[in-house]
């Protein structure tokens, strides 16, 4: 009796190891195939990544310590080289004209003013050029008036100064008329710039004013170009044109925005029915085994682990004989069972078989 039990158990283990066709899903090739644990496929490409590089200059082998004398000599040589290197003399930087600094020269040029050009003065702006007065700038020299400065000379008026000389009026006085600008005064007329005043008319620039008309640049505005360009307004061109921010704000709409992304995820997240579609041969084999037991209910999965199929009769073939069933009379569905144990199943069965054999032989 004892030997019969041992023989029965050992035979069960052997059957479990070998591939059979008795509806037991044991594939020896799959069981032996170890996913991700293949000792035959060894990547040897990284074996030479950690080669030890010896120093050719010193020629010392691995594990040797560098000689202290050699290190000291090298340190001394490096120290001598550093001492022998002549110190580079400090180069004097070229004196550049400081923007925003007085002492600007030119016809109505106001030092430190950015790029304002025109016949009118660029009031309160650096590097303003023109024949008009430069309102609110110190020590400007030229034909334009030095606005806000006491010793301004030229044809323009000295804006805001009592001792202004030239043809222009003394800036800071109401109703001044002439070639000089009446800085800080309303209704000033003439060739000079009316610094900081609205509705100024004439050849002078209307410093910092939006409605300036004439040949003078609207001072206080960067990048003004042309006669009477409104300086400080970006891209303003023309006589007294105060045109801010024109022509370059286009292209705000993204071209072809998000088109093609509407269908980017189409087909994603869906079941991969093409890959998991049941094989016709597998279905036929399974049907041949359980043809007599197929009903309108789903049959058990054809495998005990992994991917398999299950079938059932369609409604119109419910009363049809089992021998007459075809693929058109059946509904087939893929089924997924728990993942097969693989190598662990083989090892456990092998250990069990060895134990049984030992017990059978020594008892």
Curated annotation (Swiss-Prot):
Q: How does it sit in the membrane?
A: Lipid-anchor; GPI-anchor
The annotated regions of Polar residues compositional bias extend over 48-57
For this UniProt record, give its keywords in alphabetical order, as a comma-separated list: Cell membrane, Cytoplasm, Disulfide bond, Glycoprotein, GPI-anchor, Lipoprotein, Malaria, Membrane, Repeat, Signal, Sporozoite
The sequence repeats extend over 98-109, 110-121, 122-133, 134-145, 146-157, 158-169, 170-181, 182-193, 194-205, 206-217, 218-229, 230-241
Q: Which stretches does UniProt call biased (Low complexity)?
A: 260-277
**InterPro entries in alphabetical order:** Crcmsprzoite, TSP1_rpt, TSP1_rpt_sf
Q: Where is the lipid attached (GPI-anchor amidated cysteine)?
A: 340
Q: Where is the composition biased (Basic and acidic residues)?
A: 61-96
Taking the first listed entry, what is the main subcellular location of this protein, grouped into a coarse class?
membrane
Q: Where is this region: Disordered?
A: 48-278
- Location within or outside the cell: Cell membrane; Cytoplasm
A GO cellular-component term linked to this record: side of membrane
Q: Write out the domain note.
A: The N-terminus is involved in the initial binding to heparan sulfate proteoglycans (HSPGs) on the surface of host hepatocytes. The N-terminus masks the TSP type-1 (TSR) domain which maintains the sporozoites in a migratory state, enabling them to complete their journey to the salivary gland in the mosquito vector and then to the host liver. The unmasking of the TSP type-1 (TSR) domain when the sporozoite interacts with the host hepatocyte also protects sporozoites from host antibodies.
- Per its database record, what is this protein's job? Essential sporozoite protein. In the mosquito vector, required for sporozoite development in the oocyst, migration through the vector hemolymph and entry into the vector salivary glands. In the vertebrate host, required for sporozoite migration through the host dermis and infection of host hepatocytes. Binds to highly sulfated heparan sulfate proteoglycans (HSPGs) on the surface of host hepatocytes.
The protein depicted here goes by the name Circumsporozoite protein
Q: Which organism is it from?
A: Plasmodium knowlesi (strain H)
**UniProt gene name:** CSP
């Amino acid at each position: 009796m004892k030997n019969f039990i041992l023989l029965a158990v050992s035979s069960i283990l052997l059957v479990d190891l070998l591939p059979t066709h008795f509806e037991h899903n044991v594939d020896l090739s799959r069981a032996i195939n170890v996913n991700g644990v293949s000792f035959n496929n060894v990547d040897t490409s990284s074996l030479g990544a950690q080669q030890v590089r010896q120093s050719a200059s010193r020629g010392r082998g691995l594990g040797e310590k560098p000689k202290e004398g050699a290190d000291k000599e090298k340190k001394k040589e490096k120290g001598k080289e550093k001492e022998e290197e002549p110190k580079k003399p400090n180069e004097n930087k070229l004196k550049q004209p400081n923007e925003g600094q007085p002492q600007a020269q030119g016809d109505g040029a106001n030092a430190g003013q950015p790029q304002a050009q025109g016949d009118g003065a660029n009031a309160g702006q650096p590097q303003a050029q023109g024949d008009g007065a430069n309102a609110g700038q110190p020590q400007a020299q030229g034909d334009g008036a030095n606005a806000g400065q006491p010793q301004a000379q030229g044809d323009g008026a000295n804006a805001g100064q009592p001792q202004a000389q030239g043809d222009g009026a003394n800036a800071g006085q109401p109703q001044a008329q002439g070639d000089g600008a009446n800085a800080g005064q309303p209704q000033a007329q003439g060739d000079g710039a009316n610094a900081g005043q609205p509705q100024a008319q004439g050849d002078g620039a209307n410093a910092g004013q939006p409605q300036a008309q004439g040949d003078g640049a609207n001072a206080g505005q960067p990048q003004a170009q042309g006669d009477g360009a409104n300086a400080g307004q970006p891209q303003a061109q023309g006589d007294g044109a105060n045109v801010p921010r024109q022509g370059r704000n286009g292209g705000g709409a993204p071209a072809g925005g998000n088109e093609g992304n509407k269908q980017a995820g189409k087909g994603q997240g869906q079941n991969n029915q093409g890959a998991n579609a049941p094989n016709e041969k597998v279905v036929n084999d399974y049907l041949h085994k359980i043809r007599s037991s197929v009903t309108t209910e789903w049959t058990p999965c054809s495998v005990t682990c992994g991917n398999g199929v299950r079938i059932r009769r369609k409604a119109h073939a419910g009363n049809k004989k089992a021998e007459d069933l075809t693929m058109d009379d059946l509904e087939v569905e893929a089924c997924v069972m728990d993942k097969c144990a693989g190598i662990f199943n083989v090892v456990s069965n092998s250990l069990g078989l060895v134990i049984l054999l030992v017990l059978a032989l020594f008892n």
